[in-house]
Amino acid sequence: MKQAYYSCEEHIETVLDMYIDDHELPPEIRKIEHTNSLSTACELCGDPAVYIVGNE
């Protein structure tokens, strides 16, 4: 089970559903700041991630 999922703007609802299906708990959603140099891609399409979904 993954602890965090990464999502673009378009796929945030789907990624939220994936997290809830896996963990059966509501996740924390954090917007990735533009100043961060995080080069993580969306879980579904590979575009740059805008959100981190998870409870870390």
Curated annotation (Swiss-Prot):
Pfam family, one: YyzF
Protein origin, superkingdom: Bacteria
InterPro entries in UniProt: YyzF
Protein name stated in the entry: Uncharacterized protein YyzF
Organism: Bacillus subtilis (strain 168)
Gene that specifies this protein: yyzF
